[in-house]
Amino acid sequence: MIVGDMERKHNINLFLLSVLLLMTAACSTTRNLPEDETLYVGVKNMEILNEDKTPAGVQTLEEVEAALSYPPNNAILGSNSLRFPIPFGLWIYNDFVKYQDKKGVGHWIFNKLGSTPVYLSTVNPETRVKVATNLLHDYGFFNGAVTYSVDSLKNPRKAKLSYKIDMANPYYLDSVMYLKYPPRADSLIRAAYDQRVLHKGDNFSVLKLEEERQRLSTLFRNNGYYYFRPEFITFRADTLRKPGMVSLQVVPKAGVPADAKRPYYIGNTSVYLTGYKGEEPTDSIVFPGMTLHYSGKKPGIRPGVLAKRFFYQKGQLYSQARQNFTQEALARLGIFKFAEFRYAPQDTLPGCDTLNVRMNATFDLPYDGELEFNVTTKSTDQTGPGAIFSLSRKNFMRTAATLSFQLKGSYEWQTNSTADGNSSKLNSYELGTSFSLEYPRLVLPWMSKKMMSSRFPQHTSFKLYASQLNRARFFKMLSFGGTVSYDFQPSRVWKHTVTPFRLAFNTLQHTTTRFDTIVDKNRSLKISLGNQFIPAMSYTFTYDNAPLKKRNNLWWETSFTSAGNLTSLVYAAFGKGFKETDKKLLNSPYAQFLKMTSEVRCLFKVGEKQHIATRLMGGILYAYGNQTVAPYSEQFYIGGANSIRAFTVRSIGPGSYRPEDKQYGYLDETGDVKLEANVEYRFPILGDLYGAAFLDAGNVWLLREQKNEEGENIRPGGLLTLRNFAKSIALGTGVGLRYDLTFLVIRLDLGIALHDPYDTGKKGYYNIPKFKDGLGLHFAIGY
């Protein structure tokens, strides 16, 4: 028997060695190159002469180097010179190119895993140096030049490139003058002089000239010059007056049309509404500021709702900004299939300075229905299907509001064995429904028309919901409630959400003996899961610079929640102390706490398709007054696919505490304080397949020791202290795959635990008893 095993192992080793030798023999990266092509393997050297280290010079050099850079096959981080030593993509291309025009598995492997060779002709260095030289000239380096040379390698079918960049002396602006503009336009230029892009002493830059041209055109169009265009502005540059200096004149182009030289005022506004079935307008109504043409007995939308989205009035100067605000506000209503504006002179008389406005719009379908099916796999060993049915009525009661109904349900079963040996049986379900009414404005009685007519999005949402959660072998819980929330965005990057009313009620309909045994040992857990109201209000602000389209993105969100305090103030007004406990709302206890969370995410672009993503999240929850334990749904937990991926959900914390019954102890692993940090490097592998390497750290802690009736600490090690803070941080690393389907990203992560916050019986910082015990596999959707 032993001899047989040895023979099998020997045969396997021979087979693997044979495969390796065959791959090595076949793995030529130039075997299938066309005869007249050379494989490009990167940039050998990029020499800089007369380098300009000023901010303008650094920016110029970055642009020039970007124009010259071209990553070869298997580049590291998009580098033009660093490459991975094993070119799998090229090997696959060479071995499977014969399947390029065929069908089957070979064709799929070629398309998805193969990497097309980067030829020297593809890089086209001659064209690149011309582009780079033009960039130098555009940035004011008129004497600059870029040259290249081809460096042959040991393999004559491969080559590298070397570039030489001579920045020579740059030119600067000596003077900037705005000449030959009509008096009114000249006054506008002088009034906005502080906003100019061009300044004396700046580096000469063609890009800055174009930016100034756009600025002036926008300035004129925002002040009545409807027919003005950027191309009506030209520049005169004199480089002979002073060596290395440019005397610049910004002047109108010769032959500017007469109608572009005068401002226009807004005349009559007419709105033509076409039904979603194509019904043409048959009637009209005159409303202050507009004439509304519609089909049917009534306009499809209330005239007042429409009028509040128009940011101009009759007699005002035409403004491109107000036109853009109006179009954006109408698009946000979500009730039109399309809407277009046309401006035309009020008459054909010479010198006419009035534009009539016509808006043509077609209503979208009034109902939206959606049926969504999904399969959920959770890191708590729960998996199962779910479904969501949604039905929305747009333009409800002709107010542009949306009335929505949603019905959802899901089933889950446990995929591992339970403590009593049972396995894989249906053990959980959730059913829920909700009604919501959302207005595209702030619905407040004291809100002025000016505040309601914000150029940025505003929403008011009223929502009622109910859900039933059944955790077999534990409990059945019914939750219902309602919210009123206001969203408004004062700028492109800032958003505020105010929820002045949020009332939820949780009640346990049924519990099992196993669940009762767990909570009887922990009074705090019993209170947090008990029947109670949660009367709360909250405020959230969000910063997101993604609309600015910067290279690196920053997202920051902070939330503040207050629960039960207003209710306790009402009780205090009637003689019950603010700190008095066991007060009730509708004959049930209510929660009282303060909660704050903050999360920052940064996404840094380090290559063409490479990113480094960082995340820092913290939160604190303080329960007091009526109840010193916050509801279970509000407490913090950690672990899982979107947290520390080396650990499953609620498998660590608080602090270094470890439940005696680990199988069901996750109910007890929550806290009042949370700190979590992640850093992840994302890089392309092949085609739409991306890889990731990550590092996660964090934990949850308690603000107070929790004791039983005998005064014993029931969660030792869970208290937040500076003394053991570092040791109580869980740490994990890992790698993952991301498959980008454009409309969603499928994510598979393998987490590897490096440090467990509790005593595992193993000494040292790496205290994972067995390597396999520290592995966590997570499947998820989205980043």
Identify what each model region corresponds to.
Residues 7-8, 28-332, 341, 354:
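Interaction-mediating elements
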Residues 23-26:
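C-terminal motif of bacterial Sec signal peptides marking the signal peptidase cleavage site
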Residues 697-719, 743, 751-766, 783:
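C-terminal beta-signal and adjacent terminal beta-strands/loops
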Residues 371, 403-407, 462-464, 556-560, ...:
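Membrane-embedded beta-strand positions of outer-membrane beta-barrel proteins
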Residues 50, 165-169, 180, 250-254, ...:
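Flexible glycine-/small-residue-rich
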